[in-house]
UniProtKB/Swiss-Prot annotation:
Residues the entry annotates as binding Zn(2+) 2: C816, C891, C898, C901
Catalyzed chemical reaction(s): RNA(n) + a ribonucleoside 5'-triphosphate = RNA(n+1) + diphosphate
Record protein name field: DNA-directed RNA polymerase subunit beta'
Record's subunit section: The RNAP catalytic core consists of 2 alpha, 1 beta, 1 beta' and 1 omega subunit. When a sigma factor is associated with the core the holoenzyme is formed, which can initiate transcription.
NCBIfam families (UniProt xref): rpoC_TIGR
Xref: HAMAP family: RNApol_bact_RpoC
Cofactor: Mg(2+); Zn(2+)
Length: 1406
């Protein structure tokens, strides 16, 4: 293997393979000439009679090299001995035919041609340099107008466009004092004339003076481009070509088909076109043809070169004979079928095969069954080797013959070869890393691959015709990696959430569940056994039924943290069958873990606890044994489905009759006009969905229990042994919803647009459906299938974007030493805790010391501790509410992440290793469940939304209440009224652990005091959900200002009470004279101050003029528009929106700074909202009038507080509240979507993606750097730059963190290779070429593209070693230089030499 690597690394004919970076630049005419081996002068390709390439044509052997190895075209020189000879007759060099793949030619263009990429790829680089519009440049290039290139002493301006008429006029007027040209020639001259240094200096002076934003943007763009040209040594005139390179002929082949036709690459057509036009143009110029003809020919040449480079970018695409657009050079590299994605990132692999999979229930977890035929083919070379080394064959040829005849010895050799040589199995689509795992092959007859049932979950495989691919790791290193890292036994835990993925399902669960269930009056009930073995013997001899309840003496072994073992014996009440499970459990587990009904959840818990307690090896063996036991017992249990198992509940008829009566009643009300059509529909749908639930409940109650006569002859109820119930209850197959359709009623169906059909299907499948019912149900079924197809594509695209943005994130060091982190709190929704603190911080490292609640000096957990299961218990027992934990987002390493900030590797259960590619892992973990998410937008309307309005808070459990952020006033009635916006009430238990937390709206009445003890179920706060109160915080006298009936207000009389009150009119409803009046209540407080409350439109005033009011009184109420039907984006589209950082429509408006609120003069459709802070700074913004503003005049708001409700805008959260708040928001929102589908993903994965979204910053002030306001720069670069500036006592750069969506972030990555292979290839490559960008090959993708080991996992060490070797070389070079210097010195120079040597050494070390 080492020799192989040496061969690969040895210098070959084309120089050394080793390189550290790749640069892309514009090619100058000289460079193109230097690549070329000759000029292509003729459009001919090959002679159709002799099939020999034409001389000077597109396939010319003289230019590009011989067609056959070591043979010239005319046949004078054949064979290897003439290598390097150039034939005198045909001019062909005698060499390998392979050179036709890399020898290029060129075409000398008769007139310059602009490169379409730099012209049309937006922003147009030529346009930006010349500071002209694209439209104008095109008019010049395509010969519509002249452009003045040299105005001389005339009144014309440089860059002025002249049409024919103007040009001839100017000629008459000025003669030849000026120069004006057209075509690419003119553009080339103008580009040549640009003095980069001068332009740059002018712009640098002009930029600080500009006031307008748009001008500033344009100027800084232009300046950037000019500097890029200056720094990259690209010359602007190179964007116009005088010489066109020709691709080597073997990369644009011409293949003869039968029948004398040829299949050819489209490029040949395109080149032929260019050559024809070029030759014609040369002839016309020699003949000095009329200007108009030459012009037309030049234009056609420009168009043909455009088509060759990028067909269809300008005008209509040129089509071939079959009406299809021809594939140009640009099309070759972009898109899914382009070079990047088809050939560089997705190669096909040798030594592989694929076949159908079948189940292998007798295999061990690390094995797979490989068909003999397949194994023989895959391991052929290895088998030849064994045959030779064992002397069974003398030559390779003989061995080959033996293998072809399939002689008996061959199989023995194959078995030896295969022994302990793992193979990789892969099932497409490979959505996460567990879709490719290593197994040891076991030779089997037949043609199908056998797969172990427990790995099906990871592969998402089933046996209904799925196929899988087999790959053979050839080298020793590859075999080692397969065994150590990819073996199925080393991948027990899922990388997404750290829980076991090797969990039995379906039949196995059914078998285990059956034997762990107890049954009354089973054979052997009540027996008592001295040992487990006795009981097992009784089961074996049929004296004891597996479902019988018995007592047995059990000996358990406990292992403590230090590995000490203690034994404990006790008598347990159990079910006989559970002893079968106990019998295979590893030593160190407790009996209670298997002494319960083995549902799928419990089995998963059992395997998880086994892994944590006794490690990988035991767990794998246990999982295998569980599977064998489950399969055997499922067979013995005889569970099967009969039609009588679907028991229809006797109550069903009665329940449905009641519902029908209710529906009739509503129909009557509708006919009499008491309810609207919408209300009727909502109520009917409501009734039927309630009815469906009632039927389902009756059915489940009926199914779930059996009545049975026990040993004493009494009737007692027990859990049912109905087959369908057993399957559903164990989690093996089917759900309550499916059983409901079999034996309950099918219920309401949806139309394809998602709306519900109000006629339900009252029948179930057992009763059978009528034609109409069947017809209704086809809607839903078909929509389901269509949805699935759509979902798969969308989910795949999301995964691709995620992988692309995160691919270069790798663990690069052990500790970055940061003290930053995120503050972790339990996740709370609707008052209850969904995720405990322990679950959130498990596997993370503490960023700061965790101290005791009652004593902040005493340290409970020191900073830098990895929190494992033991520490989680400590946290729970000490009632810790929040922890500062390290996070990927706050990691301070320049490239990659450090292992302390990442914490535990979820798939291995220990601290993450250096080199683990956490980025790709995160992307896969988030993308893989994507297909399980829904695609739909939820319409919450009518009955559903009206019920969900809360108007009070009742606590669930007893505890002590704590008020947070709460500002209250005491009302005269004694209760407190809240006058702050973000008030919360938290509830803690007797240990001080937070149990519940509630947000309390503004204006609520709080019915308890701070720190008061409350009972479970007690109401602690209430409010009116339909109005928004205006509350006074002071007592005093109310006085009306500008509130006049008919002008700014109207009098409303309440029908029920007969009381009248004022209602403020909206500005649009007032007469013109009253438009500018601002109705308000002025409160003269008892302290003698004046407080003004401005009243928004539609306020209903609750006090009268001159009335005395108490503190906490309500002055007025603003009705809340009931939020009708809102569409909630759910599922996959929601996740995509969050990661793309899209700004939601009508998003929440947040306070830009802390201060006091006031309202300025209104405009036509907007309110002027003003915040004044303590220093008197003012922030103004205009808010549309239809937005409901939550705050009133003179209220104090904090920065980032919500002023107008709506969906949150992540960019605002980042700007106003910082990155911790942003991380919390995105993590929680994404998790809510996944949680709804019951998918568990660790928060760390989402944080990894957020880190990548926060890579860039926007500069707000360039300081003493050469950056400008508005530049987008990498965060890491700016940090390094600022450190440097501060060290030199200069002004650092001021910047704001930016949040980029994942697509934008992928395209903005430092590596142009990675960006180009993702999307918008043309744009990325154009931008990179102009700036002469260097790709440092840091990420995974770039390295795959150039064909190196990736800098992750085992490849990271290889790259580190390479780097160290390079640095060593540099140091040696410096030393040698120092010694060379000493050779030329005199003895008296020795002192100075020593200094020089020391300096050299120091430089070398840096």
């Amino acid at each position: 293997m080492k020799d192989l690597l040496d061969i690969m690394q040895s210098p070959t004919s084309n120089g050394n393979h080793e390189f550290d970076s790749i640069q892309i630049t514009l090619a100058s005419p000289d460079v193109i000439k230097s690549w070329s081996h000759g000029e292509v002068k003729k459009p001919e390709t090959i002679n159709y009679r002799t099939f020999k390439p034409e001389r000077d044509g597109l396939f010319c052997a003289k230019i590009f090299g011989p067609v056959k190895d070591f043979e010239c075209l005319c046949g004078k020189y054949k064979r290897r001995k003439f290598q390097g000879v150039i034939c005198e007759k045909c001019g062909v060099e005698v060499t390998t035919a392979k050179v036709r793949r890399d020898r290029m030619g060129h075409i000398d263009l008769a007139s310059p041609v602009a490169h379409i990429w730099f012209l049309k790829s937006l922003p147009s680089r030529i346009g930006l340099l010349l500071d002209m519009t694209l439209r104008d440049i095109e008019r010049v290039l395509y010969f519509e107008s002249y452009i003045v290139t040299e105005p001389g002493l005339t009144s014309l301006e440089k860059y002025q466009l002249l049409d024919d008429e103007d040009y001839y006029k100017a000629l008459e007027e000025f003669g030849d004092e000026f120069t004006a040209k057209m075509g690419a020639e003119a553009v080339q001259d103008l580009l040549k004339d640009i003095d980069l240094d001068l332009e740059i200096d002018e712009l640098r002076e002009a930029i600080p003076q500009t006031g307008s934003e748009t001008k500033l943007k344009k100027m800084s763009k232009r300046l950037k481009l000019l500097e890029a040209f200056r720094n990259s040594n690209n010359k602007p005139e190179w964007m116009v070509m005088n010489i066109l390179p020709v691709l080597p002929p073997d990369l644009r082949p011409l293949v003869p088909l039968e029948g004398g036709r040829f299949a050819t690459s489209d490029l040949n057509d395109l080149y032929r076109r260019v050559i024809n036009r070029n030759n014609r143009l040369k002839r016309l110029l020699e003949l000095s043809a009329p200007d108009i003809i030459v012009r037309n020919e030049k234009r056609m040449l420009q168009e043909s070169v455009d088509a060759l480079l990028d067909n269809g970018r300008r005008g209509r695409a040129i089509t071939g004979s079959n009406k299809r657009p021809l594939k140009s050079l640009a099309d070759m590299i972009k898109g899914k079928q382009g070079r990047f994605r088809q050939n560089l990132l997705g190669k096909r692999v040798d030594y592989s095969g694929r076949s159908v999979i079948v189940v292998g229930p007798t295999l061990r977890l690390h094995q797979c069954g490989l068909p003999k035929k397949m194994a023989l083919e895959l391991f052929k070379p290895f088998t030849y080797n064994k045959l030779l080394s064992h002397g069974l064959a003398t030559t390779i040829k003989a061995a080959k013959k033996m293998v072809e005849r399939e002689e008996p010895q061959v199989w023995d050799m194959l078995a030896m070869v295969i022994r302990e040589h793992p193979v990789l199995l892969n099932r497409a689509p490979t959505l996460h890393r567990l879709g490719l795992q290593a197994f040891e092959p076991v030779l089997i007859e037949g043609k199908a691959i056998q797969l172990h049932p427990l790995v099906c979950t990871a592969f998402n495989a089933d046996f209904d015709g799925d196929q899988m691919a087999v790959h053979v790791p050839l080298t020793l290193e590859a075999q080692l990696e397969s065994r150590a890292l990819m073996m199925s036994t080393n991948n027990i835990l899922s990388p997404a959430n750290g829980e076991p993925i090797i969990v039995p399902s379906q039949d196995v669960v059914l078998g285990l569940y059956y034997i762990s269930r107890s049954s009354v009056n089973a054979k052997g009930e009540g027996m008592i056994f001295a040992t487990v073995n006795e009981a097992l013997r009784a089961i074996g001899s049929n004296d004891l039924h597996v479902n019988a309840k018995i007592k047995v003496r059990v000996t358990e072994t406990h292992i403590d943290d230090d590995g000490n073992r203690t034994k404990e014996t006790s008598i347990k009440d159990t079910v006989a069958g559970r002893l079968l499970i106990w019998n295979i459990m590893p030593v160190g587990m407790s009996f209670d873990e298997c002494n319960e009904e083995m549902t799928k959840k419990n089995i998963s818990k059992l395997i998880n606890s086994c892994y944590r307690k006794v490690g990988v090896k035991e767990s794998v063996m246990f999982a295998d044994q569980l599977m064998y036991l489950g399969f055997a017992q499922a067979t013995l249990s005889g569970v099967s489905i009969g039609i009588d198992d679907m028991v229809i509940p006797p109550l069903k008829k009665q329940i449905i009759e009641v519902a029908e009566a209710e529906v009739r009643e509503i129909e009557d009300q509708f006919e009499q006009g008491f309810v609207t059509a919408g209300e009727r529909y909502n109520k009917v749908v409501d009734i039927w969905s309630r009815t469906n639930d009632k039927v389902a409940k009756a059915m489940m109650d009926n199914l779930a229990t059996d009545k049975i006569i026990n040993a004493k002859g009494e009737e007692e109820e027990q859990k049912s042994f109905n087959s369908i119930f057993i399957m559903s209850d164990s989690g093996a197959r089917g759900s309550a919803a499916q059983i409901r359709q079999l034996a309950g009623m099918r219920g309401l169906m949806a139309k394809p647009d998602g709306s519900i059909i109000e006629t339900p299907i009252k029948a179930n499948f057992r009763e059978g459906l009528t034609v109409l019912q069947y017809f209704i149900s086809t809607h839903g079924a078909r929509k389901g299938l269509a949805d699935t197809a759509l979902k798969t594509a969308n989910s795949g695209y999301l995964t691709r974007r995620l992988v692309d943005v995160a691919q270069d994130l790798v663990i690069t060091s052990d500790d970055c030493g940061t003290e930053q982190g995120l503050l972790m709190k339990p996740h709370i929704q609707g008052g209850e805790i969904i995720e405990k603190l322990g679950e959130l911080v498990l596997g993370r490292v503490t960023a700061r010391d965790v101290t005791y609640n009652d004593d902040a000096e005493k340290i409970l957990i020191p900073a830098g501790t990895l929190i494992d299961e033991h520490w989680v218990k400590v946290l729970d027992n000490n009632a810790i509410d929040d922890i500062w934990a390290r996070s990927v987002i706050t990691c301070e390493i320049e490239h990659g992440v450090c292992s302390q900030c990442y914490g535990r590797d979820l798939a291995r259960g220990h601290k993450v290793n250096i080199g683990e590619s956490v980025g790709v892992m995160a992307a896969q973990s988030i993308g893989e469940p994507g297909t399980q998410l829904t695609m739909r937008t939820f319409h919450v309307g009518g009955a559903a939304s009206s019920a969900s309005v809360d108007n009070s808070i009742s606590v669930r459990s007893a505890g002590q209440a704590h008020f947070e952020n709460m500002k209250t006033v005491q009302h005269t009635d004694g209760h407190l009224v809240i006058v702050s916006r973000s008030a919360e009430i938290a509830l803690t238990d007797e240990l001080g652990r937070e149990r519940e937390r509630y947000k309390v709206p503004y204006g609520s009445s709080v019915l308890i005091k701070d720190e008061e003890q409350v009972e479970g179920g007690q109401t602690i706060a209430k409010w009116d959900p339909h109005t928004h109160p205006i509350i006074t915080e002071f007592a005093g006298t109310a006085r009306f200002s500008e509130i006049t009936d008919g002008l700014t207000a109207t009098v409303k009389v309440d029908d029920a009470t007969g009381m009248s009150s004022f209602e403020i009119l909206a500005t649009r409803d007032r007469s013109s004279s009253a438009k500018d009046l601002r109705p308000a209540i002025i409160l003269n407080t008892d302290e003698g101050k004046e407080v003004i409350y401005f009243l928004p439109a539609e306020t209903i005033i609750r006090v009268s003029d001159g009335e005395k009011v108490a503190a906490g009184s309500i002055l007025g109420r603003v009705p809340q528009a009931s939020s009708g039907t809102k569409d909630i984006t759910g599922g996959l589209p929601r996740v995509a929106d969050l990661f793309e950082a899209r700004r939601p429509k009508d998003h929440a408006i947040m306070a830009e700074m802390s201060g006091v609120v006031s309202f300025g003069k209104e405009t036509k459709g907007k309110n002027r909202f003003i915040i004044t802070n303590e220093d008197g700074e003012i922030h103004e913004e205009l808010i549309p009038k239809w937005r409901q503003i939550n705050v009133f005049e003179n209220e104090t708001v904090a920065r980032g507080e919500v002023i107008a409700d709506g969906p949150q805008n992540p960019h605002d959260i980042l700007r106003l509240k910082g990155q911790t708040a942003l991380a919390d928001y995105i993590v929680n929102e994404v998790q809510d979507v996944y949680r709804l589908q019951g998918v568990k993903i660790n928060d760390k994965h989402i944080e990894v993606i957020i880190r990548q979204m926060l890579r860039k910053v926007e500069i707000t002030d360039g300081g003493d750097s050469n950056h400008f306001k508005g530049d987008q720069v990498e965060y890491a670069d700016i940090k390094a730059l600022n450190a440097k500036l501060e060290a030199e006592d200069k002004f650092p750069v001021q910047f704001e963190r930016q949040l980029l969506g994942i697509t934008k972030a992928s395209l903005a990555t430092e590596s142009f290779i990675s960006a180009a292979s993702f999307q918008e290839t043309t744009r990325v490559l154009t931008a990179a070429a102009v700036t002469g960008k260097v790709d440092e090959l840091r990420g995974l993708k770039e390295n795959v593209v150039v064909g190196r080991l990736i800098p992750a996992g085992t490849g990271l060490a290889y790259h580190k070693a390479r780097k160290e070797k390079a640095e060593q070389k540099l140091q040696d070079k410096d030393l040698n230089a120092a010694f060379d210097m000493s050779a030329t010195t005199d003895s008296k120079d020795f002192a100075s030499f020593d200094e020089a040597f020391a300096q050299e050494l120091n430089q070398g070390n840096h």
